[in-house]
Amino acid sequence: MATATNGNASAAAAAADSAVQEPPHKIAKVAPLLKVKKLSENAVLPSRGSALAAGYDLSSAAEVVVPARGKAMVPTDLSIAIPEGTYARVAPRSGLALKHSIDVGAGVIDADYRGPVGVILFNHSDTDFAVKPGDRIAQMIIEVIVTPEVAEVEDLDATVRGEGGFGSTGV
């Protein structure tokens, strides 16, 4: 068994630990292209509000009034080719939800859909909500999707949670 007589081994180990480590090389990933077709002059291409924003803003292509306590379909006049292996989730914009009680419904765009994209807006307030062409009305988030095969089984694997739902893990 070898031992260090003057501490050189431990000094070398400490120096190695404090040495500047090169970051692992990142493999450049080529992002898939989001192909978008404008169907009218009022259509606005989806855009992200910042470099790290998850969602692409979707804008109205028409004047629409969402009635108080009601809903309306707002056209974007866009057709979008969602990349294979993903889908687009159409989600509310936080500012519209907070300031005007505007929410989004039924927001899934499948990768094989090529028709015009419309956004269903729900107005949870007591006043009508006016939408003008160019207004940002929702955000579109591209998400990876897993589509497993369906298999009918006699029993499911047991879990600690079991059949508890609807608040069973706490409120």
Curated annotation (Swiss-Prot):
Binds 1 Mg(2+) per trimer. It catalyses: dUTP + H2O = dUMP + diphosphate + H(+). CDD domains: trimeric_dUTPase. Mg(2+) binds at residue 143. The keyword Magnesium applies. Its EC number is 3.6.1.23. GO terms for molecular function: dUTP diphosphatase activity; magnesium ion binding. Signal peptide: none annotated. Pathway: Pyrimidine metabolism; dUMP biosynthesis; dUMP from dCTP (dUTP route): step 2/2. Keywords: Hydrolase, Magnesium, Metal-binding, Nucleotide metabolism. Its cofactor is Mg(2+). One of its GO terms (biological process) is dUMP biosynthetic process. Belongs to the dUTPase family. This enzyme is involved in nucleotide metabolism: it produces dUMP, the immediate precursor of thymidine nucleotides and it decreases the intracellular concentration of dUTP, preventing uracil incorporation into DNA. This is Deoxyuridine 5'-triphosphate nucleotidohydrolase. It comes from Oryza sativa subsp. japonica (Rice). The gene is DUT.
